[in-house]
C-alpha cells in the first residue's frame, strides 16, 4: 500500500492509496465480488443515502457482507478488512491527518459491496459512519468509462476528483460529501465487467 495523493476537503484530508491488495488478494476479492453479484440489492434495500423527499441518491446494486455471509470471517473481503486496523497502517494514516486517530477507537465495522454498470451513479452524499474507505475492483482491460469519485467541500465546491483505478483505495472521514460519476459501459454484457466498490465503514459503537 502506498499513499499517492492527499486531497484537502474543508479542514481534513482524504488519502488516496494504490495497491491496497497484493495481486493474489485482489484476484480473490474480485472473485468474491462477482460471487456476490446475484445477491446485490436495489438502492431501496441496500442502505442508500436519500434526498429530502426520501428518494435514493444512488443507482447501483449493493449488499453488506453481513447480509450475504452467515459469518463475517467466512468472507475473504471480511477477513482481509481487518488489515486496515493493523498498528502500522493506523499510525501511517494518523501521521497524515490526526482525524484518522479515530480508527484506534473504532470497535465496529462492516463492508458493503456495490456494483456499477451502465448508467449507474451515486449523487453527492455523506456516510453514517466515522471513517469510510472505498476500494475499487474491475476486470482489466477496463470495459467502462466514468465511475470516478468527486470530493465536495461544505460550500459545495469540488475539492478533488479521483480516477477510478483498480486496486486503489480512498479513505476519508465519513462526514465528507462525495459522489460517483455515471458509469458508461463500452459494451453492455452480462459478464460483470463493470465497477465494483468495497465500502468499509468504521464506527465507534455497535454495528448498524
Language model features with spans:
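Short histidine-centered beta-strand/loop micro-motifs
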Residues: 122-127, 160-163
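A short glycine-rich, His/Asp/Glu-containing loop-to-beta-strand
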Residues: 103-115
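Short, conserved beta-strand element in jelly-roll/cupin
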Residues: 115-116, 126-143, 200-204
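Residue-level detector of short, conserved catalytic/binding motifs and their immediate flanks
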Residues: 13, 111, 131, 168, ...
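Membrane-topology and secretion signals of cell-surface/extracellular proteins
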Residues: 43-47, 56, 100, 132, ...
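Short beta-strand segments enriched in hydrophobic/aromatic residues
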Residues: 21, 33, 137, 174-176, ...
Amino acid at each position: 500500500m502506498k499513499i499517492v495523493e492527499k486531497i484537502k476537503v474543508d479542514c481534513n484530508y482524504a488519502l488516496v492509496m494504490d495497491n491496497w491488495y497484493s495481486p493474489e488478494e485482489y484476484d480473490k476479492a474480485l472473485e468474491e465480488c462477482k460471487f456476490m453479484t446475484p445477491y446485490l440489492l436495489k438502492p431501496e434495500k441496500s442502505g442508500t443515502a436519500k434526498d429530502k423527499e426520501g428518494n435514493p441518491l444512488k443507482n447501483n446494486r449493493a449488499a453488506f457482507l453481513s447480509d450475504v455471509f452467515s459469518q463475517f470471517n467466512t468472507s475473504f473481503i471480511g477477513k482481509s478488512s481487518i488489515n486496515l486496523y493493523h498498528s502500522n497502517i493506523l499510525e501511517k494514516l494518523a501521521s497524515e491527518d490526526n482525524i484518522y486517530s479515530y480508527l484506534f477507537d473504532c470497535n465496529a465495522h462492516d463492508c458493503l459491496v456495490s456494483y456499477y454498470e451502465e448508467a449507474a451513479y451515486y449523487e453527492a452524499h455523506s456516510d453514517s459512519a466515522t471513517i469510510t474507505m472505498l476500494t475499487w475492483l474491475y476486470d482489466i482491460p477496463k470495459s467502462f468509462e466514468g465511475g470516478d469519485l468527486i470530493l465536495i467541500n461544505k460550500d459545495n465546491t469540488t475539492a478533488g476528483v479521483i480516477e477510478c483505478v483498480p486496486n486503489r483505495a480512498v479513505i476519508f472521514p465519513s462526514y465528507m460529501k462525495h459522489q460517483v460519476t455515471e458509469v458508461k459501459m463500452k459494451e453492455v454484457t452480462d459478464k460483470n465487467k463493470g465497477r465494483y466498490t468495497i465500502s468499509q465503514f468504521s464506527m465507534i459503537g455497535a454495528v448498524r
